[in-house]
Amino acid sequence: LAKAAGIDPFHRKKSDPPINREMGNKILQSLLELDFEKLSPSEQLSMVRTYQVAMVRFGKPSKQTADQIIAQLDAHFPAKTFEMNWLLCETLAFLEAPTVAKKGISLLNKATTQEEQMEYARSLRNLKSGWTNELRTQYFNWFLKEANYRGGASFTKFIEFIRNDAVASLSNAEKKELAPLLAQKAEVKSPAEVMAEAMAGRTFVKNWELEELSKISSRGLKERDFA
């Protein structure tokens, strides 16, 4: 219904019929009537994703409706899975939920993979509400750390776009306050240096030869001691 009754702004033509905002409101109200806790995990994901599609197609809801959606979803954020946290962080940030900055930065700091970290950083990039200087500092410090992450050909540009959007969302006062941090250049290290830091503190066991490892692997790897 959202796709049929509303066309997103990026693909809208002058000849297209006007957005059916009444249908958009009905979709949002129907979602608000659902009991999140009674839904299965896959249904919860579908529910939040439907909110996203509806808001892209019909535009940001009124403050009253936005507050209702925030009240419905914020109680379940953070969730138990990355997939749900990603969608909730993205949706609540779009609605300018007052707690999403703190919760999102906490998830960003705890995320164990660069992929998860990138999604949280991307979701928070346009958020303007709920920030403190400490949270902003943690957020922009992440961009200094991620300079040593690795990805495909467009990886660096993708991160640059996220950071540019985040800087653009700052007020003039915030830009002035964070100026030293925003001007700081990341220390880019070689893959060998990054690996050496990751291995720091580990005990040297043995300088293995390829022939030794080949023999061990051919015997099977069951009942190994990882201690």
Listing of model-derived features with the role each one plays in the protein:
Residues 1-227:
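Long, ordered, helix-rich scaffold segments
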